[in-house]
């Protein structure tokens, strides 16, 4: 069974839970303006004390339960952008892709990972997660892929 989670009352759509290993996590959904063709939120998973977390399937199950609940309440797209401060973004991207691949409902979703290069040619990992039955599916997916292409375009 996943971890018991608490919704923070002061902040809409932010959840906190503590693993059996004493690691504190928060999951947040914040409205995002990147995609204009439909409602979108940025998804954030934070280990806010920075304690190293061992592999823990209950963390995955808890996070995916929270994501599932989000999609049951919202006809929105989720943007997942990996934290880059410590150089572990590629590992985070792979881990989240794996979590999503074993998620029971994954066939109902498009999970579209992309790499965005910054000015220093560093790889930044992002993904669009959207229900296949979202009424704005085609518009949001094409806007996301066009935005990634634009961000990766080389200035002349």
Residues of each region from the PLM?
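Single conserved hydrophobic/aromatic residue that forms the stacking wall/gate
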Residues: 1-7, 11
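Short, charged low-complexity intrinsically disordered segments located at boundaries
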Residues: 10, 92-100, 124-135
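Surface-exposed beta-strand edges and their flanking turn/coil or helix-capping segments
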Residues: 30-32, 39-42, 93-94, 140-145, ...
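Acidic, proline/glycine-rich low-complexity IDRs
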Residues: 107-156
